[in-house]
Regions:
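Interfacial aromatic "cap" segments that immediately flank transmembrane helices
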Residues: 5-36, 100-130, 145-194
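Selective recognition of hydrophobic, aromatic-rich stretches within alpha-helical transmembrane segments
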Residues: 63-97, 128-162, 195-225
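Short, small/hydrophobic-residue-rich motifs at membrane-helix boundaries and re-entrant hairpins
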Residues: 2-97, 125
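Short, functional N-terminal and low-complexity linear motifs
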Residues: 54-59, 71-76, 115-117, 132-136, ...
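Short, charged juxtamembrane terminal tails flanking transmembrane helices
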Residues: 1-7, 220-225
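Outer-membrane beta-barrel domain signature
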Residues: 37, 41-44, 49, 134, ...
C-alpha cells in the first residue's frame, strides 16, 4: 500500500514541492550521469589514440579502434540508463514510501538489485524496439507504459514479465487508463516545450517534475496501488 500522499490530487504545486524536497538526489543523478558520459569519452579517446593515431593509422587499425569503442560503449550505456531511470524511480519510491528519498537510499536501491534493473531495462528496450520495428504505434504504446512499469520494477518484488503485463493492463485496460495516457502525453509536451525554450536547461526541472506528477496521477487514478 502506497503512502497517503500518493492518493492526493496531483497538481503543479505538489509536483514542485516534491521536486524541491528531492533536489539533492536529483542533482546527484544528473552529476552521476554526466560523470559516466565523461569517463566514456575519455575511454573512447584513449582507444582511438592508442589504436588509431599512435598505431599504424591504417584502415584496419581505425576499424579496430571503432569496434573497440563500440564494445566499450555497452557497459557505459547500461550504467547511464540505470542512472537515468532514477528520474522515474525516485518519484515512485517517494510516493510508495511517503518519505523523502535521499542520495544514499536512491543509489543503495539501485545497487541492491542491480541485475534485476539491468534485465528489466533490456526486456523493456527489446519489447519497445520490436514495437517500433514492426509498426511505430505499438512501439509508442509500449513506451507510454514506462512510468507504471518502472514503479512496479522498483517498488515491488513481482517478476519482470508480471510487472510489464500488469503495467500494460493498468494503462490500456483499466477504467482510468486513457485519462492517464492523456495526462502523460500532455505532460510530455509541456516538458518538451520547457526544454526547447530554455535551450535544454529547463529539462533539469521539467523532467523530474513531470515524473513526480505522473507517479502521483497513476496512484490517484488507480493504476498503481
Amino acid at each position: 500500500m502506497a503512502a497517503p500522499l500518493a492518493y492526493e490530487q496531483p497538481t503543479f504545486q505538489r509536483s514542485w514541492d516534491a521536486f524541491l524536497l528531492h533536489i539533492p538526489v536529483l542533482v546527484a543523478v544528473w552529476v552521476a550521469g554526466l560523470l559516466v558520459t565523461l569517463v566514456f569519452v575519455a575511454v573512447a579517446f584513449s582507444i582511438y589514440l592508442s589504436l588509431g593515431v599512435f598505431g599504424d593509422a591504417s584502415d584496419f587499425a581505425l576499424g579496430l579502434a571503432s569496434t573497440a569503442v563500440n564494445l566499450a560503449q555497452v557497459p557505459f550505456s547500461i550504467l547511464s540508463s540505470l542512472i537515468g531511470v532514477l528520474m522515474v524511480a525516485v518519484p515512485a519510491m517517494y510516493y510508495e514510501q511517503g518519505e523523502t528519498v535521499t542520495i544514499g537510499a536512491a543509489f543503495s536501491q539501485l545497487t541492491a538489485r542491480f541485475w534485476r534493473y539491468v534485465l528489466a531495462g533490456i526486456f523493456f528496450g527489446f519489447i519497445t524496439t520490436i514495437g517500433f520495428v514492426f509498426c511505430i504505434l505499438p512501439g509508442i504504446a509500449v513506451a507510454l507504459v514506462t512510468p507504471v512499469y518502472v514503479n512496479r520494477i522498483f517498488v515491488t518484488d513481482m517478476s519482470i514479465g508480471d510487472a510489464f503485463s500488469q503495467s500494460f493492463q493498468a494503462v490500456y485496460r483499466s477504467e482510468n487508463g486513457m485519462s492517464f495516457l492523456g495526462l502523460e502525453i500532455l505532460t510530455g509536451l509541456l516538458v518538451a516545450i520547457a526544454t526547447i525554450v530554455t535551450c535544454g536547461l529547463g529539462a533539469l526541472v521539467a523532467v523530474p517534475m513531470g515524473s513526480f506528477y505522473l507517479q502521483n496521477a497513476a496512484y490517484k487514478q488507480g493504476l498503481l496501488r
